[in-house]
């Protein structure tokens, strides 16, 4: 009996060993995601009223989407949107206003990578520039704040922004790469009254690469676009009214004095001082190359239809050769002067400093023909 019990116990033990489940495999341990980063990516923040500018400056890196709703930016204060987290989306809602102070600005500053800044339907950034306008612009009188610094932006977009009555220059684009601006409206028409607004450039571009501006509507009192330095810049499907037209320059006297590969395409220029202008500063050095104006229509130019000067800033002197203008194309450019006080085409080049120009289907009428053009390149004429 004892032997039988021992045998039975041995069998039960063997069964128990065979039936014991295998130890489960340990799962691979991975590091938990940073909860603070997840929070940042998922956070929508809204800032409004007179304290909104201060709060967004302190909290902007905690937000992936920032709504600026009816913001009232205090006097002497920049709406600080610099150094945003990659991928941040900023949306203006309602009317954004700015307190009055004589200072240089800017009123708004944005920087970062993969940033989107846009205006919601009906949103307005109102500079109320009449508080500063005195006919002097940036050349004297009251110190006036520039409006919007789009500096050090990479792979970013600014779209559907409506800016009204800027005190002085509007967009400063500097140190930017792969930046697209779409459907921007700049309305400074109130500044036409008594010629009080001045130097209200729409887009000033410097030291930037791969910049695209399309669908802009600019009503101002200075350059619609002024490209002082940069490469691969495209401006298209836009309207410029009341200002100084589509400008390269002024080039010279800066750290970077090279403008290369610029295209203006499908632009209407209305009631402006001139439609097309290239400005190389007298006595300075740099280069302007691969410039194309294509499908440009203009009407009622007051001073010039087309003007190219290598003695800008000192037009009483003989043009210099330090900023050559090469590979300059005009194609399908048609426009009118307002009256015979307007010179249809004026070219003032230094000796041998303008070359490889190609103009086709270019017509300017309604003004006077210049007899003072200098060193006009082969195949080009001031009498169209």
Curated annotation (Swiss-Prot):
InterPro entries: Glyco_hydro_28 (IPR000743), Glycosyl_hydrlase_28 (IPR050434), PbH1 (IPR006626), Pectin_lyas_fold (IPR012334), Pectin_lyase_fold/virulence (IPR011050). Disulfide bonds join 45-63, 224-240, 349-354, 373-382. Transmembrane segments: none annotated. Its EC number is 3.2.1.15. It catalyses: (1,4-alpha-D-galacturonosyl)n+m + H2O = (1,4-alpha-D-galacturonosyl)n + (1,4-alpha-D-galacturonosyl)m. PANTHER family: POLYGALACTURONASE. One of its GO terms (molecular function) is polygalacturonase activity. It comes from Aspergillus aculeatus. PbH1 repeats lie at residues 176-207, 208-229, 254-280, 288-310. Keywords: Cell wall biogenesis/degradation, Disulfide bond, Glycoprotein, Glycosidase, Hydrolase, Repeat, Secreted, Signal, Zymogen. This is Probable endopolygalacturonase C. The keyword Signal applies. It is found in: Secreted. Residues 20-40 form a propeptide. Belongs to the glycosyl hydrolase 28 family. Glycans are attached at residue 261. The keyword Disulfide bond applies. GO terms for biological process: cell wall organization; pectin catabolic process. The active site is at 222 (proton donor), 244.
């Amino acid at each position: 009996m004892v032997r039988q019990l021992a045998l039975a116990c041995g069998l039960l033990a063997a069964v128990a060993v065979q039936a014991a489940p295998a130890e489960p495999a340990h799962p691979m341990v991975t590091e938990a995601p940073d909860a603070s980063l997840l929070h940042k990516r998922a956070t929508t923040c809204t800032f409004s009223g007179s304290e909104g500018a201060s709060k967004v400056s302190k909290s902007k890196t905690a937000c992936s989407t920032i709504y600026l709703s009816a913001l009232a930016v205090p006097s002497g204060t920049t709406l600080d949107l610099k150094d945003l987290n990659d991928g941040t989306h900023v949306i203006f809602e309602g009317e954004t206003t700015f307190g009055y102070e004589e200072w240089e600005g800017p009123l708004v500053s944005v920087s970062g990578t993969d940033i989107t800044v846009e205006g919601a339907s009906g949103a307005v950034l109102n500079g109320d520039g009449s508080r500063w306008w005195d006919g002097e612009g940036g050349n004297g009188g009251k110190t006036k704040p520039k409006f919007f610094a789009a500096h050090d932006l990479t792979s970013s977009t600014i779209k559907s922004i409506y800016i009204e009555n800027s005190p002085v220059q509007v967009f400063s684009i500097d140190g930017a790469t792969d930046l697209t601006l779409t459907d921007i409206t700049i309305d400074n028409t109130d500044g036409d009254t008594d010629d009080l607004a001045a130097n209200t450039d729409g887009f000033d571009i410097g030291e930037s690469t791969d910049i695209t501006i399309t669908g802009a509507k600019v009503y101002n009192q200075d350059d619609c676009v002024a490209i002082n330095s940069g490469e691969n810049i495209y401006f298209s499907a836009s309207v410029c009214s009341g200002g100084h037209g589509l400008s390269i320059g002024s080039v010279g006297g800066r750290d970077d004095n090279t403008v290369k590969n610029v295209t203006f395409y499908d632009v209407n220029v209305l009631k402006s001082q001139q439609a097309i202008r290239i400005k190389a500063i007298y006595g300075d050095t740099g280069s302007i190359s691969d410039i194309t104006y294509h499908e440009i229509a203009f009407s009622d130019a007051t001073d010039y239809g087309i003007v190219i000067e290598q003695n800008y800033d000192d037009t009483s002197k003989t043009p210099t050769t330090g900023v050559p203008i090469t590979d300059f194309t005009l194609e399908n450019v048609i426009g009118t002067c307002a009256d015979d006080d307007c010179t249809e085409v004026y070219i003032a080049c230094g000796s041998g400093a303008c070359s490889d120009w190609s103009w086709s289907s270019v017509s300017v009428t309604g003004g006077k023909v210049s007899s003072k053009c200098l060193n006009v390149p082969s195949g080009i004429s001031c009498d169209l």
